[in-house]
Amino acid sequence: MSARFNHLKADAHWQGVWESQGTFQARDDSPKPKSYVLEMFPYPSGRIHMGHVRNYTMGDVLARYRRMKGFEVLHPMGWDAFGMPAENAAMEKKVHPGDWTRANIAAMRDQLKRIGFALDWSRELATCEPDYYGQEQALFLDLYAAGLVYRKESAVNWDPVDMTVLANEQVIDGRGWRSGALVERRKLNQWFLKITDFADDLLDGLDTLDQWPEKVRTMQENWIGKSQGMRFTFVLDAPAGDLTSFDVFTTRPDTMFGASFAAIAADHPIAQALSAGNPALQAFIADCKRTGTAAAEIETAEKKGYDTGLSVVHPLDPDWKLPLFVANFVLMDYGTGAVFGCPAHDQRDLDFARKYALPVKRVVAPSPEEAAAPIGDEAYVGPGRIVNSAFLDGLSVEEAKAAVIARAEAGGWGQGTTVWRLRDWGVSRQRYWGTPIPIIHCEGCGAVPVPHDQLPVVLPEDVAFDIPGNPLDRHPTWKHVDCPSCGKPARRETDTLDTFVDSSWYFIRFASQPSDKPFDRAVAESWMPVGQYIGGVEHAILHLLYARFWTRALERIGRIGVKEPFTGLFTQGMVTHETYKDPAGQWLSPEEVSDGIVVATGAPATVGRIEKMSKSKKNVVDPAPIVEQYGADAVRWFMLSDSPPERDLEWTESGIEGCWRFVNRLWRITDVSEAGDGEDRELDRKLHKAIAGIAADIEALGFNRAVAKIHELSNAIEKAAPSASRAAAARALVRLVAPMVPHLAEEAWARLGEQGLVADAAWPAHDPALLVDDEVTIAVQVNGKLRDTLTAPKGAPKDALERMALESEKITRLLEGAAPRKVIVVPDRLVNIVA
């Protein structure tokens, strides 16, 4: 037997066997119970990175384990293949986005196969192919027919570099998430999906997702943002054009007596009316438009206002007037596009009031005695009683809210209502490399759906990327078609769908891929929902919320009988690495540094923080040469070891070397040529505890704990004398490690003379009787202090334990021949000698 595991030979051989035999192809008609394991599919950038490897290794271990436990497992792979990077590559490298994307897919597919993932490649899909996006177009039209899709003019986040619209979630600190350009606010006709129709259901459904991380559920709850409050009317003291009043929504009607101003959005009808002939206000509104529509950006931007010179009448006191501002922090598409400001109890309002010298009046205090306590630099947002508020004085905050709403409803100037932070999903993107929206615009008929028998609407190949913007707008023929309704000349919609639409249903298409429809309902329902979904927490709002909405929308129109797409969700940590700089402050890759020295120059390198691997800081480790040098199993083992999977994992050279040594150690341990005879009850017990414990750890995604148990069992097997028990333990170990180091396991399984593949073998069964220890450790105390420990048979009688304790060498020496006054025995736990 070779003492060293030949990973190069084994990896290639067994990967070929699995592929040729279709080992991991899931059968829709299998009589076995079904299990659907899925990692978030990747964007085909061209290279697999270590974050991918960690993510897919976790899912792979679970998928392989569940196969061994008797499940028919669906574990597919595909490509989230539309998006801006392909268009950027087209502009920079003069290559068609489709060619660039498909070449990247081929490269990444090969890389994934070299790591030995148990994937069903027969179900591979790419969202950029017409057989996928054509079915997406069919679903879009179904939702359109159901009234869940509409088009309207809307203020949007416009990226002037990528020349496309961004969703609020894609604007980070006022900049486009891909280009980094400062985002502008514009009005464009956009297509929307009515996600707000499902707001209550999306919120309520979070309570059923008990296998999701609490932080993800909280993030979605906050994003949906259900607010109970009051909608009421402010009357202007003078008209703005023909407008004399406007509505306001507030979640704090209890603080109305603390109001010191009212504010409206820059695109509010009153602001627009007042701007006519007012260059100063026009300039202010233009400045506001240079701020994106994302709430997070507006929250952090400097608060600015324009005093209109008008006032509004306070609805609780007709003699009380509040100045009206146009403000850059008020959004037209949240609430009513208007607010009242209560500086004492809202930090944003307080900052604004201090800037514009507006009154600050406390109306909530921890106690009545603090009614006159001044407000400093921080607004008071804590609990308390209402003060300085006429008929509300002395009430709690909730009592005051109810009282104001009751008075408003009785007076006819307001009513209690609910609003949501969640906005309808704008899905129009002004770019080429995306799913064409299957709508035709006709001057006479309006927006006309493309007939289903004319799908897919395929992207034209002959496009140019020599200037920014959408090539579909400039195409000489593609957009010119006849109206399906009246036959007159018309034009295609040239916007394409947000790529998050593509990822909102791919998991259903994996389950069923007929050529004539998006999926077969019965087949899809036999797999759905996904039992375990694995991916990064950065998708908590965007992808995961959209996928939950899309599945609900399909359920509403009768396409599928599932509402929640993912039963279990696991968000893994990142893979990190040290960062390095040369003396000039330039980033260096790990390959450019050796023992703290810049390889090229011999100069000392600066070792920086351990951070997420990123191209910008060059601390990326390419998995391909690591797999070549150490083998796929060593890389997989590293990804599972040490750190809990939900935490970050630091990549180190010493760590992968240690994993490679352990893989070779496993190769030696699983050789049972020296079988031996007889039983080793202690080893039997350790084996069966390991079988049960590793299974429980994998089910709980506690891979690092499973790895620790395999180390313990391996140590026990190595130390044990040759015996039948040792041989059995070594054979069982092969199956226990098979989900984690599958190439070694297959090689060892074949060496043992076993039939078939270990991938198809059953998980070892454990004997519950062997999980119970036959022996226990007894603490021996003298006058309450621990002095010795004993090993005794479980259930030993009290007199036997007392005798063993008194005969202990340590205890005999301590007692110095004196008889104890009393001996207290707690069976299986403790002997306490009172001297």
Curated annotation (Swiss-Prot):
Record motif 'KMSKS' region, residues = 612-616
Q: Does the keyword Cytoplasm apply?
A: yes
One Pfam family it belongs to: tRNA-synt_1
One GO molecular-function annotation for this sequence?
A: leucine-tRNA ligase activity
Coiled-coil region: none
Question: What GO biological process term is on the record, naming one?
Answer: leucyl-tRNA aminoacylation
| Reactions this protein catalyses | tRNA(Leu) + L-leucine + ATP = L-leucyl-tRNA(Leu) + AMP + diphosphate
Residues forming the motif 'HIGH' region are 42-52
Q: What InterPro entries has UniProt attached to this entry?
A: aa-tRNA-synth_I_CS (IPR001412), aa-tRNA-synth_Ia (IPR002300), Leu-tRNA-ligase (IPR002302), Leu_tRNA-synth_edit (IPR025709), M/V/L/I-tRNA-synth_anticd-bd (IPR013155), Methionyl/Leucyl_tRNA_Synth (IPR015413), Rossmann-like_a/b/a_fold (IPR014729), tRNAsynth_Ia_anticodon-bd (IPR009080)
Primary location class: cytoplasm
> Where in or outside the cell?
Cytoplasm
- Binding of ATP occurs at K615
Which class of enzymes does this protein belong to? ligase
Q: Which family does it belong to?
A: Belongs to the class-I aminoacyl-tRNA synthetase family.
What protein name does the entry list? Leucine--tRNA ligase
The organism encoding this protein is Rhizorhabdus wittichii (strain DSM 6014 / CCUG 31198 / JCM 15750 / NBRC 105917 / EY 4224 / RW1) (Sphingomonas wittichii)
Q: Which gene encodes it?
A: leuS
